[in-house]
Amino acid sequence: MPSPAIEIKGLKKSYGDVHALDGVDIKINKGEFFGLLGPNGAGKTTTINILTGLVFRDEGSTLVFGRDTVSDYRFTRSKIGIAAQEFSVDWFFPIEKLLFFQAGYYGIRKKDAAPMVEELLTRLGLDKKKNARLRQLSGGMKRRFQLAKALVHDPDIIIL
C-alpha cells in the first residue's frame, strides 16, 4: 500500500505559553480532498507552515509521501503548492515574470518553465494580463494568479 500523501502524528507546536497544536493527527491519502477548518487561532496556518518547512514542529512527525518534512525538506516542499491568502510577491514585476521566478525557486529553468507558465496563464484567463503588475489585477485575478503560482512547479498536493 502506498504512503499517504500527508501523514501527521502527534504534532505539537507552542509559541511561548500558547499551544498552537497539541497532538494533532491527520492522514490524507493521494487523491483525497481534505478540509482543515477551525476558528482563528486554531492552528490551521501553523500546520500548513510546518508541512512546508516554514515552521519547525516541537514534537510529532509530519510526512509527505512517507518522507519527513524536516530531514527531506526539498522533496516534501517540491510536492506541495500553496495558494496563500496573502500576496507575498514583488509587486514591481509583471505576473508572467513572477511565475518564472516561482518556477526558478524549484530549480526549473526558464525554457523548461515556459510551456507551463503559458498554459497556466491561458487556462486561468490571465494570458491577456501577463505583462500586468499584481496591483493592476482585480481581486479575482489576483486569486487566480496565486493558484498559478501554486501550480507552476506541478506539485502533487495543492493547499488552498
PLM segments and residue spans:
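Walker A (P-loop) phosphate-binding loop of ABC-type ATPase nucleotide-binding domains
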Residues: 39-43
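Hydrophobic anchor residue at the start of the ABC signature
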Residues: 147
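Conserved ABC ATPase signature
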Residues: 133-137
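Conserved ABC ATPase "signature" region
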Residues: 100, 104, 111-129
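Conserved ABC transporter NBD signature motif
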Residues: 60-71, 75-76
